[in-house]
Amino acid sequence: MSTIRSIHAREILDSRGNPTLEAEVTLEDGSFGRAAVPSGASTGTKEAVELRDGDKTRYLGKGVRKAVDNVNTTIANALKGVEASDQEGLDRRLIDLDGTENKGRLGANALLGVSMAAAHAAAASSKQALWQYLAAKTGVTPSLPVPMMNIINGGAHADNNVDFQEFMVLPVGFTSFSEALRAGTEIFHSLKSVLKGHGLSTAVGDEGGFAPDFRSNVEALDTILEAIGKAGYTAGEDVLLGLDVASSEFFENGKYNLVGENKRLTSEQFVDFLADWAAQYPIITIEDGLAENDWAGWKLLTDRIGKKVQLVGDDLFVTNPKIFQEGIDSGTANAILIKVNQIGTLSETLEAIAMADRAGYAAVVSHRSGETEDTTIADISVATTATQIKTGSLCRSDRVAKYNQLLRIEEALGAGARYAGRDAFVSLKR
């Protein structure tokens, strides 16, 4: 039987050395599932609540003992005997048990850990890999996503003078995920060499990308183009560029305060700034180009470049179906970033991806800056209509773990493996 026998949670460490929650679910047939919950640095104000202890004498207040205790008592007691394979029913019980709009009573970290661990256990009970199990539920033919590789870190992810949070390469001109991964890796190592040649730091940020000081934000783009060429690839053909502007982080008093550029721009001026970059560089995707509450600015940007550039809402939508529907109805952005801990259960995550597909929006499955060795998001990216995955750079085991899982999945799919490549940008009318 795939009913739940027991649930257990513990406090572990994430990639930033902060506590996070790990949950384990054991079924009556002996099947077992484990999942660890990620944590973000730049967070949307409307995200589901990550429950922290607030005890400054322990882990600087970032402990998660309260969330762990909620799993080991309230949640474990309520879900004992529940069918693990009924993911929607299980998640509905979790949501009702919490009873708040933002999952703040028990903690989204408590709910998500159990939700994902239950899926792992149910997959094990059905003798399937998680991606196979989820694909059977979604009815989607598995495919390998395009990786959005964050090779230069700035903003909240690094201690440097770069305003924008992520500068990414997307290896689209390849026929397999493994070849795309190889290209990205070679560009990463080429970039290290280029940075050294310019006398710049090769220390890495939270997500494994390099975090040097540049004279301007655009210098980061120019340096990446140099690295792509040095690695033997062609920007605009083999490899496209992406940005996570994370503009909510520097939106102050109605202006975009670019310290690295010594500029304070209105929404209209910042849209011009981004549109100019998109015209000058092979940029295919821009995430959080405008601040999360600047819906008028977002609409301006969408109308300006939304037919040529994928515009991804992260802080804007926070993987929340209700907020996402507002974006769909108003024609704001054309893609959504999917972060499991922004919404707090697996079912709601899958529904957000399905919503995107129905609306003609692209879906990008994403890690958080505080990660673990958990690879659940890799399986989700394969088993749904999401066409891209964002899981950091080509170093740090917490990032590489997801890439390695995708390599295993591609191998398991064999001749049936399909890599999204240039078809990944489903929302663009080219």
Curated annotation (Swiss-Prot):
Where is it mainly found? cytoplasm
Gene coding for it: eno
Reported function: Catalyzes the reversible conversion of 2-phosphoglycerate (2-PG) into phosphoenolpyruvate (PEP). It is essential for the degradation of carbohydrates via glycolysis.
Could you list this entry's UniProt keywords, alphabetically sorted. Cytoplasm, Glycolysis, Lyase, Magnesium, Metal-binding, Secreted
User: This chain belongs to which protein, by name?
Assistant: Enolase
User: What residues bind (2R)-2-phosphoglycerate, as annotated?
Assistant: Q165, K339, R368, S369, K390
Q: Which Gene Ontology molecular function entries are recorded, alphabetically?
A: magnesium ion binding; phosphopyruvate hydratase activity
Catalysed reaction per UniProt?
(2R)-2-phosphoglycerate = phosphoenolpyruvate + H2O
Under InterPro entries, the record lists: Enolase (IPR000941), Enolase-like_C_sf (IPR036849), Enolase-like_N (IPR029017), Enolase_C (IPR020810), Enolase_CS (IPR020809), Enolase_N (IPR020811)
Q: In which pathway does it act?
A: Carbohydrate degradation; glycolysis; pyruvate from D-glyceraldehyde 3-phosphate: step 4/5
